[in-house]
Structures are given as structure tokens and as C-alpha cells.
């Protein structure tokens, strides 16, 4: 065991003394030391309750013969950091989380890890750190919040407070209407109620095999959530005894299973970044081509918010992620023999699962669409690729040709949208928002939600080298690579250019001649980094790679 390096032998008497200072006993130090990574804080609704989840994990570990030791992790709320300079930090924090887990685990010689997180960048950051270390590990989420209810209808943070901002600006909502919506959009703790990035990643963790069945959908307030956490504490001890490490589970086939699930449920476009980043740490080669190939053959069979009216609690009641995976397995669309943290194969985990509501989980022969939720676009505007959540695009906007309205930053675009300077048919271009250029690759939820609130989602597209919240819907193409700050074609767009978007044929094109683009490229000057000297973001901008490879650090 790794922990023997700090607990055994005469030379480790000082180390044991430090443990005894905290109340650990000699008997505790003879057991495997299990690091419980707790990302609880009092600023993220999805993490506010995690101390309760961690206590359940600890009980499970102790009951199975281990010594649980809690260590902290940071966590940023994408919602609260949205639409201001703070949004430069969430994606960049993913790497901080991975690095801090590496540092804490190696410094203290933990034998295994239970990773307790919930929200957007915390999930991949934790899995990246554990994959890098290649120790036995299990991921446990805090679970989704329940949707709100107002005037007999279910609402959530996106189909509620965010989209209400645009509706208020349009004069559709009164002050009282807006106040009621913001009071009712988030009624409980937990990750936001729809299939946004947090719940997408928590669900994909089941398909990857790194979390127990139910991890993605059991609501945060339910007792079953604490039961799952306790079982995870027991299971980590089994993994230690069987010497099953995370990379034994995180194979190429496991990632393909996760992508297949992603396509079937219509997960967040951010999953492309995060799965590639986790794969990078697990030494698995994963590319945008893997997403595109799998998307073309996996039907889209659930339509949760923001694309539809169902929420995570509805998916849970319909059979959960296990039921979706069972549908895919029965059609030979996933690899069923993959090892999971239960110590069993994926097939053994899900073989008895049933779809309990086929209006929430449709059969494969009656999908919402024959292709998966995410499409990868290419063309002269995105030679290295771009990403769109096609499952959340209205059919009439799968093809669009429009005039470019160019903005060098989110704030300028948002102001133009709110001041009604964007018109039907336009293509809003928000650039210099990529991993290097921002730096940090901000999410554009506020502009996209404002477009919807103004009723423009069936006539106006938005493209960016930034990214989108999992709550974004509509014809929004992100992750355009190369990014503007690297001299990508998006930097060469001029006001009034024509842009053609053809999602069905996976194309995005700037309708400008190659000769004109070459001339513009010669005159392009790379802007300086916007991050102040001495900051983490300045260092991040020097090391981060393209969104087309997961925005990992070199």
C-alpha cells in the first residue's frame, strides 16, 4: 500500500505523531488510507450539501475496513460567474483541481480516492487528477436539484431565470414576473435540474464505469443519494483489495460508451472538451472524429431541458442512465464487457434495467432524431472543428445563411442583443473568447438566453471560439478552432460577411474568397494577452491548447 510510506517503520515515527495529533489511532494507520476529496463550499448550490454526502462515504469506507481522510477541492459556480470577468476561471479551474488532487495524493500517500463533486468543471477536474495518478478511485456526485414550479409549469435556471432576462427586456415580463421566476427557478440544492454540463458529466461517469449506477440522476434531496455515497465507500475498499486502478476502467471502449450515451441523451457540448481532457490523462487517444463518428450512428432518445421539457428527476423515474444504456446495449451500440467500479462489467450492472416511461426514454425505433445530440462541423471557418448541440436546434435552423455581426468579446455582443441591434437572419460572431484569447474560454449563456428571450432563436445564429453552457439551446456553434487569438479564420471575419451553417452536412463556411482571406490574414495582428501579469490566467494562456484537443495544458 502507498500509505506504508507514511505509516510504517521507525523512520515514520514523526509522521505517525502528526496523525495522532488529529485523533487517528494506531489501528487506523494499519488500514488503507482513503482520500475523500470534498468540493463542498457555500457558493455553489450543487456543492452546498456535499458534507452530508461525504459523511455517508466515510461511513462506507470505515465499515469496509478503511480509514477515510477528507481533503478539500475548490469549486466554481458557472452560473454565478456567468456574463462577467469571473467566467474566465471555471474552465481554467479544471486544471487546478486536477493538479491539487495530484499534489495532495502523492504528498500524503493515499491508497485510493473517492471523489465527491457535482458541478461543471469539478467533475472532469477530479477525474483528470485521478486518471493521472492511476489509483483506485470512484466518483460520487451530489445529485441534481429538483425543478421549480410556477403557475403550474416546471422551470429551471435556464428555462426560467436566464431566459427571463431577454423576455423582460422585450417587455414580455413585468418586474413582479421576473421576481417570481428568479425565486422559483432553483428550489433545492443540487446541480441545476436540466441536462446541462454538470448532469451531463455526472451521467457520463456511469457510462465510463467510474461511478455507481444512479450517480447521474438520483436527485440531491433523496435518501437514495446518501445510500449511493455509502455504497461507494464500501466499493472503494473492494477496488483496493482487488488492485483495480482507474486506468483499468478508463479504456478507449469506455470513452466510446460515454460518447454513445452522450449522443443518446443529448448532453452538453462541453462534454467534448472534458472527455478528451480525461482521456488525455488516462493515456487514451480521443478526438473530435470519435464524437462525430459515434454521433452519426446513435439515435437521440431523450429530450431533457434545455432542449425539452423533462428534467433529471423525470429521467431518474423513467429508469435512469442504466435504462438508457440497456437500450443501447440491446442494440449492440456500446461495449458491454467494460470493467466498472462495481467490480463487475457494464452489462452486469445494467442487465436488469427497464425503461419505466417511454415518453421520457424513447425506444430506439422512435427517436427524436436518428443522429446523436452533438455534431462536429468543419469548413474554412473551422478547419480544426467546431461543436454544436444539434439536438437543441430547431429544424428550420439546421441550415442558415446570414450576415455576420462581429463582436470582439461577449460583453459587446450582449449589449447589442439587449439593445435590439441584432435582427432576424443575422449571425452573431463572438470572438477572442477561446482558451488562449479570453483566456479561459467563457460560456456564452447570457447572449444565447437573451436571443431566446427576444424570440430570435428561429432566425438568428451565434458562433464563437468560446463555448456554451449546457443550458444553451438554439443554433449556437462553439469551440471554433483555431481560435481568433491564434489567427484562426474567425479572426478574419468582417461585419457584413456572409456565413453559411449546414449542420446536417457538418459544414460551417465563411463565404469569402481564399484570396481575400489571405489578404486579411497578412494584415491581422495578434492582440496581447488580456490577463494581467502575475495571474494564474496569464500562466494558463501560455500553456493551454486548442479546444479541438480538449483545452488541456501542455
UniProtKB/Swiss-Prot annotation:
Cofactor note: Binds 1 [2Fe-2S] cluster per subunit. This cluster acts as a Lewis acid cofactor.
Top class in the EC scheme: lyase
UniProtKB keywords: 2Fe-2S, Amino-acid biosynthesis, Branched-chain amino acid biosynthesis, Iron, Iron-sulfur, Lyase, Magnesium, Metal-binding
GO cellular component: cytosol
PROSITE patterns linked: ILVD_EDD_1 (PS00886), ILVD_EDD_2 (PS00887)
Catalytic reactions of this protein: (2R)-2,3-dihydroxy-3-methylbutanoate = 3-methyl-2-oxobutanoate + H2O; (2R,3R)-2,3-dihydroxy-3-methylpentanoate = (S)-3-methyl-2-oxopentanoate + H2O
InterPro entries: Dihydro-acid_dehy_C (IPR042096), DihydroxyA_deHydtase (IPR004404), DiOHA_6PGluconate_deHydtase_CS (IPR020558), ILV_EDD_C (IPR056740), ILV_EDD_N (IPR000581), IlvD/EDD_N (IPR037237)
Binding site residues for [2Fe-2S] cluster: 119, 192
Binding-site list for Mg(2+): 78, 120-121, 443
UniProt keyword Iron present: yes
PANTHER family the record matches: D-XYLONATE DEHYDRATASE, D-XYLONATE DEHYDRATASE YAGF-RELATED
Description of how the protein assembles with itself and partners: Homodimer.
Function: Functions in the biosynthesis of branched-chain amino acids. Catalyzes the dehydration of (2R,3R)-2,3-dihydroxy-3-methylpentanoate (2,3-dihydroxy-3-methylvalerate) into 2-oxo-3-methylpentanoate (2-oxo-3-methylvalerate) and of (2R)-2,3-dihydroxy-3-methylbutanoate (2,3-dihydroxyisovalerate) into 2-oxo-3-methylbutanoate (2-oxoisovalerate), the penultimate precursor to L-isoleucine and L-valine, respectively.
Name under which the protein is recorded: Dihydroxy-acid dehydratase
Amino acid at each position: 500500500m502507498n500509505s506504508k510510506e507514511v505509516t510504517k517503520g521507525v523512520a515514520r515515527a514523526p509522521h505517525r505523531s502528526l496523525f495522532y495529533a488529529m485523533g487517528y489511532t494506531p489501528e487506523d494507520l494499519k488500514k488503507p488510507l482513503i482520500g475523500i476529496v470534498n468540493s463542498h463550499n457555500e457558493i455553489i448550490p450543487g456543492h452546498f450539501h456535499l458534507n452530508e454526502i461525504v459523511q455517508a462515504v466515510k461511513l462506507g469506507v470505515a465499515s469496509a475496513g478503511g480509514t477515510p481522510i477528507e481533503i478539500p477541492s475548490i469549486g466554481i459556480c458557472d452560473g454565478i460567474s456567468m456574463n462577467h470577468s469571473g467566467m474566465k476561471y471555471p474552465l481554467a479551474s479544471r486544471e487546478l483541481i486536477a493538479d491539487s488532487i495530484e499534489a495532495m495524493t502523492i504528498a500524503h500517500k493515499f491508497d485510493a480516492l473517492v471523489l465527491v463533486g457535482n458541478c461543471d468543471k469539478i467533475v472532469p477536474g477530479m477525474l483528470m487528477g485521478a486518471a493521472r495518478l492511476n489509483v483506485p478511485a470512484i466518483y460520487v456526485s451530489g445529485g441534481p436539484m429538483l425543478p421549480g414550479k410556477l403557475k403550474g409549469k416546471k422551470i429551471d435556471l435556464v428555462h426560467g431565470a436566464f431566459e427571463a432576462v431577454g423576455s423582460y427586456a422585450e417587455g414580455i415580463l413585468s418586474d413582479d414576473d421576473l421576481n417570481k421566476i428568479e425565486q422559483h427557478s432553483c428550489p433545492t440544492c443540487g446541480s441545476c435540474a436540466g441536462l446541462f454540463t454538470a448532469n451531463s458529466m455526472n451521467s457520463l461517469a456511469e457510462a465510463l464505469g467510474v461511478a455507481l449506477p444512479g450517480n447521474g440522476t438520483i436527485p440531491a434531496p433523496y435518501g437514495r443519494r446518501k445510500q449511493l455515497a455509502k455504497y461507494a465507500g464500501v466499493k472503494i475498499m473492494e477496488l483496493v483489495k482487488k488492485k483495480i486502478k482507474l486506468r483499468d476502467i478508463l479504456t478507449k471502449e469506455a470513452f466510446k460508451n460515454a460518447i454513445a450515451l452522450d449522443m443518446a441523451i443529448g448532453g452538453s457540448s462541453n462534454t467534448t472538451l472534458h472527455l478528451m481532457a480525461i482521456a488525455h490523462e488516462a493515456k487514451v487517444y480521443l478526438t473530435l472524429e470519435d464524437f462525430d463518428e459515434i454521433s452519426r450512428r446513435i439515435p437521440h432518445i431523450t429530450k431533457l431541458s434545455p432542449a425539452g421539457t423533462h428534467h433529471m428527476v423525470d429521467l431518474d423515474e423513467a429508469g435512469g442512465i442504466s435504462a438508457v444504456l440497456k437500450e443501447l446495449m440491446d442494440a449492440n451500440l456500446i461495449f458491454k464487457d467494460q470493467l466498472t467500479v462495481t467490480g463487475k462489467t457494464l452489462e452486469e450492472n445494467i442487465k436488469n434495467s427497464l425503461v419505466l416511461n417511454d415518453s421520457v426514454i424513447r425506444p430506439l425505433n422512435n427517436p427524436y432524431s436518428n443522429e446523436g445530440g452533438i455534431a462536429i462541423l468543419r469548413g474554412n471557418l473551422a478547419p480544426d472543428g467546431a461543436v454544436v448541440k444539434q439536438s437543441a436546434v430547431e429544424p428550420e435552423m439546421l441550415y442558415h445563411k446570414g450576415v455576420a455581426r462581429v463582436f470582439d468579446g461577449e460583453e459587446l455582443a450582449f449589449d447589442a442583443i439587449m439593445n435590439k441591434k441584432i435582427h432576424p437572419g443575422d449571425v452573431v460572431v463572438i470572438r477572442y473568447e477561446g482558451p488562449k484569447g479570453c483566456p479561459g474560454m467563457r460560456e456564452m449563456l447570457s447572449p444565447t438566453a437573451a436571443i431566446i428571450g427576444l424570440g430570435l432563436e428561429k432566425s438568428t445564429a451565434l458562433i464563437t471560439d468560446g463555448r456554451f453552457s449546457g443550458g444553451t439551446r438554439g443554433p449556437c456553434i462553439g469551440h471554433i478552432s483555431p481560435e481568433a487569438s491564434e489567427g484562426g479564420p474567425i479572426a478574419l471575419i468582417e461585419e457584413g460577411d456572409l456565413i453559411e451553417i449546414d449542420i446536417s452536412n457538418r459544414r460551417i463556411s465563411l463565404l469569402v474568397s481564399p484570396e481575400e482571406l489571405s489578404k486579411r490574414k497578412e494584415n491581422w495582428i495578434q492582440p496581447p494577452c488580456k490577463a494581467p501579469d502575475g495571474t494564474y490566467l496569464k500562466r494558463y494562456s501560455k500553456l493551454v491548447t486548442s479546444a479541438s484537443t480538449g483545452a488541456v495544458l501542455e
